[in-house]
Amino acid sequence: FGLNLSRLDIRQEAARHYKLITSVCKKLGIADYSKLSEEAKIKFLSKEYKSRRPLIPQNIKLDADDRETWTTFKMISESPRECLGAYVISMASNVSDILVVMLLQKEAGIKSCLRIVPLFETLSDLQNSHIVMESLFKHSWYVNYFKKNQEIMIGYSDSSKDAGKFAASWAQYCAQEKLGNIATKYKIKLTLFHGRGGSVGRGGGPVYAALLSQPPGTVNARTRVTEQGEVIQQKYGSESLAEYSLGTYIGAVLEATLSPPIQPKKKWRNLMDEMSILSSESYRGYLNNNKNFLRYFDEITPKNILDKLYIGSRPSKRKKSQDIKDLRAIPWVFAWTQIRLVLPAWLGTTEALQLASRGKNKLILKDMLYRWPFFYEMMDMLDMILTKTNQRVIEYYEECLADNDLKKIGRNLRKNLSLLIDLNKKLIPSHILNQRKEFRKSILIRDTYAEILNLLQANIMLRLSKKNIDRKQKEILMEAMIVTISGISAAMKNTG
């Protein structure tokens, strides 16, 4: 009938487009696209986009992955334009990642191209995002096609998994700031799209504080934010809740636009740079320099059981491998939250705050805390996460499921967590801690019930690990496991 409600965004990983165009070039005998330099790729893609001659034959034979990618573009060309929004490129890192989507849209016969939204996710991609976008904005044919409008998505989940929450938060802030400056330079109307999850480790947290802590001049009366399935009910489950949530967004966007936060001082930036480097090195050291760390994650958390349950809309891994890099951020965060370690939200921060607690840094930190909304919100989220951790529960999981090697890793992690809790109490003024304590009361109440579910979950995992259980027992235990997962998630609130 020609009616449509909300528009659907299309999302695909940059590697899939790269693989498709490489296959096409190989089959047509044009060039080995994979061996071209970035400059040569840009030149080739621009030339083919402007050419009236089609590049991809209608009857081209492709493998299953390439056929799926190409079929998506063909489907877009056959769908009403009013039903579709943006084309999001996940794991974007180069100008060619963006231009190849322009070319594929043209080749598929899409008359009015979907706006292209690069999603910068890893730490290095965030740090280089302004260089990529400035290079793109120099191509007038691209800029003019979209009438000087550009949407850019900031990845919170994978950058945190890649470098740790502290370093990722600072990289996200700097990336937005630089992207805003580049957009102003080229007179581009920029919309930042925040790919936040429900958990702090994936960029979650109170909306108002998050928007008011963005770099000055980057909101400009518009924003886009992802809302996770787990929070839709609590934010939009009734008319009054929906009105309140939308009102919060509108109020925060207006305030951030009309009364933006102050520019961070140079000494604040310098300290954040030092803390960020130290935090990232520490986080990656824990993950990469201990051969048993991945085994600890596999055996102590319910990660392997989560893989078998129908939770979430995407597979838990991008590829079939044992590498943490290939694990999606959602199960990574979810599994650590279940055992109450909530590791992705704080690991690496201890070392950063130890640096900030020395000498003159302590005064700079205090200044940042009182005068910089970004840093205040960052520390507020850290305090909330520390309240949700439970070291007795973590130790119980280890008693049930860990061998001596894994218990050693657990002791080191809990020691690091204890140091961070003490640092947080020493560095944050007592009146702020007392104020936060009032807001955390509901967490402590829910914790009483969550502890029981955690003890049950650890015992269920132990019984499921036995080889001599029959099929009926396994079914009963899996049902009980789902109940504990749901209950702990409800108690923790922001989990995925």
Briefly describe each language-model feature range.
Residues D9-R11, R16-Y18, I30-Q58, D65-F73, ...:
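Acidic, glycine-enriched catalytic cores built around paired aspartates
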Residues G2, P118, G198:
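Conserved, mostly hydrophobic/aromatic
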Residues L119-L126, G155-D162:
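Conserved radical SAM core fold
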Residues N128-E134, R202-A210:
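Catalytic cores of alpha/beta
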Residues L62-P80, N94-I110, V132-I152, Q172-Y186, ...:
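Structured alpha-helical segments in the cores of large, soluble enzyme domains
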Residues L8, G85-I89, S112-F120, Q150-I154, ...:
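Hydrophobic faces of well-ordered beta-strands that scaffold small-molecule active sites
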Residues F1-R11, S23-D32:
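Extended, highly charged clamp/arch subdomains and adjacent linkers
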Residues V24-E38, I110-R115, S140-F146, L211-G229:
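Acidic, His- and aromatic-enriched active-site or binding-groove loops in soluble protein domains
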